[in-house]
Curated annotation (Swiss-Prot):
Keywords: Repeat
NCBIfam families: PPR
PPR repeat locations: 122-156, 157-191, 192-226, 227-261, 262-296, 297-331, 332-366, 367-401, 402-436, 437-471, 472-510
Assigned protein family: Belongs to the PPR family. P subfamily.
Disulphide bridges: none
Name of this protein: Pentatricopeptide repeat-containing protein At4g26800
Statement: the UniProt record of this protein carries the keyword Repeat: yes
């Protein structure tokens, strides 16, 4: 009997070693297995093991590295007698906390299918695996495993159900997540605040605030009290949907229930007020969070800087950046890009360019957003070659320009009188990109009109319907105004009548296009 188990272990060892190499290659490229470590692996596998896994478990797995955790699991699989499932769970949990979810799944499959090794999962094991399937965006596999665990006589609990709901939410299968949550009571599982908060958060992230509010109502009806995470998710969703009055009501509701807001709650409100130019509200919320000893995070500070820049209070924005750094909060690329835009808006172009140029020295790597801002600044300063140089730098350094990058270049070329270059680049864009939007075409139409090419611009406007791009209020306004300015009254009146009859009723725009 011992011989057959030893044979099984030997064959399984090869499988584990192959699996180890696979994950080192595919799951974590930063890990390299040294020859000495490979030797120790085989020594552990075939020499009766000199290390007692119990000692390792007793010392704790809080700071264990992936390589060591993997080897510990293999060592345990080779041990005789086999360790308990509780001990295996400890190692699987440690690996899962490293976000190596695929490793956990495959390690368990190996030991479960290994000839001569008999071990049965418990509820804790099953919950680990269900969560790992969900984290790998495989909620269907998690659901299948749920069926398997029930066949083994293991009843799922609230942790199982929460993982499943979260898994479907992560995969953006909201209907399935809602369905699973609805089936919980039939499975004998009482819903809790975690499950409903997961649903509310996902619905809000998808701008589905009405269903999110319905989930909130039903959870209250079931006697489940929302917590700070629930309210923060809801307030963030309401703010992003422009429902600031509702967001404020929820904040007051939190206060009445003695639930203290957190940095996420306040940041959502500050960001929403800043984007709508309500600086007095921004100041009020900021003071409130400081009074409650809640430290702003990088998102909060970036929103505060945006609000100040929006009102041309750039010097105050600089002070806010200095305060942020003094508080130990490191600015990110969004923070610097926001402040740079504030400089550009205040005609302090050189200051904005210098700020972005200094970013790498401050330990912040450039990205598409910062490059777009820098291109815009160079064009505003009339430094066309430098602007196009940054654009070229993006393409040669793996920073893929987005449609906004191209739109900034087109607008910059027209603004600097480089009409031919703009037309040439636009022609190239039409051949190579399929994401040209109404902003792209509006820039072209406006630029061509300013270059006395009104007929050509009108022809491009007319062709938009064949490109499946719907002109918006701004596009109609520019085209009608430029046709009038060019003396093409008949065309301008016809376009205005068409807009008033067919377009305006579907838009929330001013009543008259002049």
């Amino acid at each position: 009997m011992r011989w057959s188990i030893a044979t099984a272990i030997a064959s399984t060892a090869k499988g584990f070693l192959h699996l180890h190499h696979h994950f080192l290659k595919n799951s974590n490229p930063g890990i390299v297995l040294s020859p000495s470590l490979r030797f120790r692996f085989w020594v552990r596998a075939f020499s009766g093991t000199t290390i007692d896994y119990r000692e390792v478990l007793r010392s704790g797995l809080h700071n264990i590295k992936f390589d060591d955790a993997f080897h510990l699991f293999v060592l345990m699989a080779y041990s005789y007698p086999l360790p308990s499932i509780v001990e295996f769970n400890k190692v699987l949990t440690a690996i899962a906390k490293m976000q190596m979810y695929d490793v956990v799944i495959n390690l368990w499959k190996r030991i479960e299918n290994a000839e001569g090794i008999e071990i049965s999962p418990d509820l804790y094991t099953c919950n680990i695996l269900v969560n790992c399937f969900c984290r790998c965006f495989q909620p269907s596999s998690a659901l299948s495993y749920l069926g398997k665990m029930m066949k083994l006589g293991i009843e799922p609990d609230i942790v199982t159900a929460s993982s499943l709901v979260n898994g479907f939410c992560l995969s953006n299968s909201i209907k399935d997540a809602v369905y699973v949550a609805g089936q919980m009571e039939k499975m004998g599982i009482k819903r809790d605040v975690v499950v409903d908060t997961i649903l509310i958060d996902t619905l809000c992230k998808n701008r589905l605030v009405v269903p999110a509010l319905e989930v909130l109502k039903r959870m209250k009806d079931r006697g489940i009290s929302p917590n700070v995470v629930t309210y923060s998710s809801l307030i963030t969703g309401l703010c992003k949907s422009g429902r600031l009055a509702d967001a404020e009501r929820r904040l007051h509701e939190m206060d009445s229930k003695k639930i203290n807001p957190n940095v996420i709650t306040f940041s959502a409100l500050i960001d929403a007020y800043a984007k709508r130019g309500k600086l007095s509200k921004v100041d009020s919320v900021y003071k409130m969070m400081i009074q409650m000893s809640i430290d702003p995070n990088v998102f909060t500070y970036s929103s505060l800087i945006y609000g100040l820049c929006m009102h041309n209070r750039v010097d105050e924005a600089i002070k806010m950046l200095d305060l942020m750094i003094s508080k130990g909060c490191t600015p990110n690329v969004v923070t610097y890009s926001t402040l740079a835009n504030g400089f550009f808006k205040s005609s302090r172009v050189d200051d904005g360019i210098k700020l972005l140029d200094d970013m790498p020295q401050r330990g912040v790597a450039a990205n598409t957003v910062s490059c777009n801002t820098l291109i815009k600044g160079y064009f505003q300063a009339g430094k066309i070659d430098l602007a196009l140089g940054v654009f070229g730098y993006m393409t040669s350094n793996g920073l893929i320009p987005n449609i906004r990058s191209y739109n900034i270049v087109l607008a910059g070329l027209f603004a600097n009188g480089e009409v031919e270059k703009a037309l040439s680049r636009f022609e190239h864009m039409q051949k190579t990109r399929n994401d040209l939007d109404i902003i792209t075409y509006t820039i072209m139409i406006h630029g061509m009109c300013k270059a006395c090419m009104v007929k050509e611009a009108y022809d491009l406007f007319y062709k938009l319907k064949f490109k499946r791009v719907e002109p918006d209020f701004k596009a109609y306004t520019i085209m009608i105004a430029e046709l009038n300015r060019a003396g093409m009254r008949t065309e301008a009146d016809a376009l205005n009548r068409f807009y008033q009859k067919h377009v305006r009723q579907n838009e929330s725009a001013p009543a008259e296009v002049s």
